[in-house]
Structures are given as structure tokens and as C-alpha cells.
């Protein structure tokens, strides 16, 4: 719980001006998750928190290590990182996935976001960055050599398989099921969390994908083949035609975020068309398609950041 000063005896919906002290409190809880420090309180108490001084204080606070709270608090809420622990990969299929790896994946995303804030990077680098932050456990999982110890450090990728947020294990695990990837969940997550355009719920009576046959003609079906059977229902096709290509472009990442080329012994077919018609078949192509239309990404991020700062929806 946290307690903040608010003016009393206000009518619902009535606009009012925050005092400098109240503004300082809101700013500090937003950026640091703590009450204001002595410098900010002193300036606020003297009534000197003008627009120019407010900007100076904001920059000072963002440069302070306490602003890492934005990574652990805001990024965690916005990206739903808590879901990383809700549906663990099945140990019968993925015995190397454990609590330490899950924690490292979450920490990677928190540090990645905080680095963009600290270095005042473009928000779009959140998706295009050719680097990330790993410790030895996570580097080994990603196949990145030369990293030892529990300390997280910045590393540069050697190819374009992983780029930015969509190549990070946290997102790939929380959008998977325990025993298989889910292009539907991954596509839905991108639409809902990153683009701010959640698809409608499925119509009643439509069977789950897991109820679709897994074997045909004596061979195991890939997730894509089962999805094609599933969305043959015209009621489902309108939404799935938008979600599925997004998720399929990420299907080279397995349940734990490791890179793969086959599923059930069959080569993966990840080809699809982004909602604007752009062909996408790899994570890099998906990122390029998203960045080709950056306004929805920026608008949705801004709305989520404002909601976090205000403590309410906007």
C-alpha cells in the first residue's frame, strides 16, 4: 500500500490544480516508486517547481539508479511479465527450464527497458535493438558464448534471429502453452499488449485447437497445419487471419524461447501476411512490419505509461 496526499472536499469530476508538493509526490512515486527525496521536497516546498525546474528534476531522477523501478514496476505490469510463472513449460519436454531461467528471463526484460530509459533511446529501439542483457544461465540458453557468472551484462547478437523484445524468453514463454507453442496466443499478445487492439473473444461452441487432430495420414501435424484446420470455420477466420501470421512469424522460437527449425520432425512453415499485406516469415520480418507502422506502437505505449503514472486508465 502507499499513501498519497490528495485534496479533500472535491466534487466528483471537478478539476483542480496540484500543489508543488503534491506534484513532487506524484512524480517520485511514478519514477522511483518511493516518496520524494530531500532535494525535490525542498524545491516543491518553496513553490519553485516550474515547468523548467520540473523538467530538470525529471531528468535528474531518471539518471538516478532508483529509476530502475520503471523497469521492474511499469514494464512488468504493461508486458504482463507475471504470467511468465503461470504456465511453466512441461518438464517432461523441457527438462532444462527451471526457476532460475525464468527469473533470468524476467530480469533481462526489466534491464532492457531500463537501459532505454537511462540512455534516452528511441522507444522503437525496444523492438529493433541488436543487443540484450544476459547472465551465464540465460546466455547458455540462447547459445551466446563467452558469458560466465550470475552478473547481467550487455551483449550484442551475432545474427538477426533475436531482435528487441520479441526475441526475449520472457515474452516467448508467457505466450506459450506447457507442451507446445501457440501462435494464437503470441499473435493475440502482440495485438493486445503492444498494438492496443485486442481481438474479440472467440464465438461460443468453437473447439479449442487442442481438440483438433494431431495426426493425419500417419504423420504428426505441425501447429500451423492444425491451425489451418481450425480456422477453416469462417466464424473464426476473420480474427485468426490477423493474429496467426504474427504468431507464426515467431514460431521458430519454441516454448522456452530456444531457436528451432522443425516441429514433430517436420520443417516449420512460418510464412504469412501481416495485417497490411506485408509478407512475414521470420521474427526480423515481423519487427520490420511493426516498425513500418509505428504509430499504433507509440500510441499504445504512451497510453499505458500515462495510466501507470496516474494510477488509472486514460
Placement of each model-derived feature along the sequence:
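Short basic-aromatic helix/loop recognition motifs at nucleic-acid
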Residues: 313
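Active-site substrate-binding loop specific to GH73 endo-beta-N-acetylglucosaminidase modules
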Residues: 1-309
Amino acid at each position: 500500500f502507499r499513501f498519497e496526499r490528495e485534496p479533500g472536499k472535491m466534487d466528483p469530476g471537478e478539476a483542480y490544480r496540484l500543489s508543488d508538493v503534491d506534484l513532487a509526490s506524484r512524480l517520485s512515486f511514478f519514477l522511483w516508486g518511493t516518496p520524494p527525496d530531500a532535494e525535490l521536497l525542498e524545491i516543491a516546498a518553496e513553490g519553485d517547481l516550474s515547468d523548467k525546474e520540473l523538467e530538470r528534476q525529471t531528468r535528474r531522477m531518471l539518471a538516478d539508479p532508483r529509476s530502475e523501478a520503471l523497469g521492474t514496476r511499469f514494464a512488468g505490469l504493461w508486458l504482463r511479465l507475471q504470467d511468465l510463472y503461470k504456465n511453466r513449460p512441461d518438464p517432461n519436454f523441457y527438462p532444462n527450464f527451471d526457476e532460475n531461467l525464468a527469473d533470468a528471463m524476467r530480469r533481462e526484460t526489466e534491464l532492457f527497458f531500463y537501459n532505454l530509459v537511462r540512455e534516452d533511446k528511441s522507444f522503437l529501439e525496444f523492438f529493433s535493438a541488436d543487443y540484450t542483457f544476459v547472465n551465464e544461465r540465460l546466455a547458455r540458453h540462447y547459445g551466446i558464448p563467452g558469458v560466465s557468472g550470475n552478473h547481467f551484462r550487455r551483449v550484442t547478437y551475432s545474427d538477426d534471429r533475436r531482435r528487441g523484445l520479441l526475441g526475449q524468453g520472457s515474452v516467448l514463454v508467457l505466450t506459450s502453452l506447457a507442451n507446445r507453442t501457440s501462435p494464437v496466443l503470441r499473435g493475440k499478445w502482440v495485438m493486445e499488449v503492444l498494438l492496443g487492439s485486442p481481438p474479440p473473444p472467440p464465438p461460443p461452441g468453437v473447439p479449442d485447437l487442442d481438440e483438433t487432430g494431431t495426426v493425419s495420414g500417419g504423420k504428426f501435424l505441425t501447429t500451423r497445419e492444425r491451425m489451418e484446420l481450425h480456422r477453416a470455420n469462417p466464424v473464426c477466420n476473420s480474427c485468426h487471419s490477423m493474429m496467426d501470421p504474427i504468431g507464426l512469424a515467431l514460431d521458430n522460437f519454441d516454448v522456452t524461447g530456444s531457436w528451432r527449425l522443425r516441429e514433430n520432425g517436420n520443417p516449420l512453415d512460418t510464412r504469412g501476411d501481416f495485417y497490411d499485406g506485408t509478407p512475414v516469415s521470420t521474427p526480423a520480418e515481423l519487427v520490420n512490419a511493426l516498425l513500418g507502422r509505428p504509430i499504433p506502437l507509440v500510441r499504445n505505449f504512451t497510453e499505458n505509461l500515462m495510466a501507470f503514472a496516474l494510477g488509472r486508465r486514460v
